[in-house]
Every structure is written in C-alpha cells, then in structure tokens.
Amino acid sequence: TIGEGKRVAEAVRRNNRIFRLNTWFRFKDTFYGLGTTVEPLKKLIDSGLLGWPLKVTISGTTGFTWKFFWVGKENLVPQRVPSNLDYDMWLGPAPYKPYNEHRVHQTFRGYWDYDGGGLTDMGQHYMDPVQYLLGKDETSPVKVEVDAPEQHPDAVGIWRKIVYTYDDGCQIVLEGEGFESGGDTPYIEGPLGKVYKGFRCTIPDIMEKLAEMPDPAPQNTDFLECV
C-alpha cells in the first residue's frame, strides 16, 4: 500500500541505507511483446524526432496482455481446507474469508484482499519503463480517466480503458483485453512520428539516425556508485 511504501522510505532514511526499486526492463531485456529493448526507444524519444507531447498505448495490439484470466469469481462456495495448507498462515494480515481453491494458488490475484488482477500485477512491469521513457520518474499524472464496470468488493473484475494525462500533455493509454482500438495501433505516437510493435517507425532511416546519437545513461550506475 501507499502507507507501507512511506514506512519503507522512512526506514531507509532512518538507517542510512541504500534502496532502489524498478523493473529489469529498463536495463536490457526485450520489453515483453513489443519486440525491442527499451534503450533505442529512449534514444528516439530523447532525440525529439517524434516531437512532443507523446502518447503511449499499452495493449494487446502493441504487445502487452493484461491477463484478464486473473479475475475473481463472485459468491464463492466455501470448501474444506486441504490438509497440507495452513490457510491462516496463507491469509496473513488479510481479513478472513472462507477457503475456496480459486482464492489461493494460481488465481489469488483475482481478489482485492491479495492483489488487483492483471492491472496491478502487470502494471508495474508495463508502466515503469514508460515512466522512464517519458522522463516522468519524479512526477505523476494530473488526470486519470477510467472506463470500467463497477467492481465487486471482493472479486477483481475487468476494465475497458484507462488514460493517464500529465501536465505537459503526454498520455499513457491502457486498453483492456477485448477492448483494443484495433488496427495497427502505434506503441508511441507523437506529432512528428509513430513507433509500432517490432520497432517499426514512420521516420525514414531511423536506425541510421539512432546510431549517430549517444546512448542513454545506464540505469544501474547510481546504485553502484552509492554502494
């Protein structure tokens, strides 16, 4: 939770420790189904060749599935707890709910007491590199628009579309499974160009142009220098 995050930050300061958190996709791995690492995208954005502001669309069309199979089931029927499961320990600080096999094991993400479905589970992995690409690590959206059915208090449901808008006009658009805009949706879109899945770009000779530009600063140097 936000409160727990604040307490972690306070403990780090109080004990004069080093702490860093983001995802590995800033560094080198291919960014899920996008078909490229983050580095050339960062070079392209920082070059200004796409213009500004930018819109980033995270959807199945651009290579990112939201795992809607991680939704919960309403009105679960209580079941006998398996003899090899300490259900009380599994619940931990979460409020007690009668055991049902769908509440634990591989499908626990579909219940608000333990997770938030594919959006909160995969969102950190999908959106952290985008914050980095857009240079938004030190800021937050000024407006969030959500198109989703009313959610059940226990079981996580689906959603259709979420739009984050920043004060400079940049947007991050999340499109839920089955609600994609369709067609050949660009992953990154600016007033001067577009980038699609597989690093297809509307800017001519983009790879040659990027080869002449400096690489972005490594993302792990600050931690190593602190150590």
Range-by-range predicted roles:
Residues 59-65, 94, 148-151, 178-179:
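Glycine-rich beta-alpha junction loops
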Residues 2-88:
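A contiguous active-site-proximal alpha/beta segment in oxidoreductase catalytic domains
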Residues 98-101, 115-135, 159-161, 181-227:
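C-terminal helical cap and adjacent loop that interface with cofactors, partners, or active-site loops
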Residues 80, 88-168, 213:
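Rossmann-like dinucleotide-binding domain that binds NAD(P)(H)
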Residues 18, 155, 225-227:
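C-terminal helix-rich "cap/oligomerization" subdomain common to oxidoreductases
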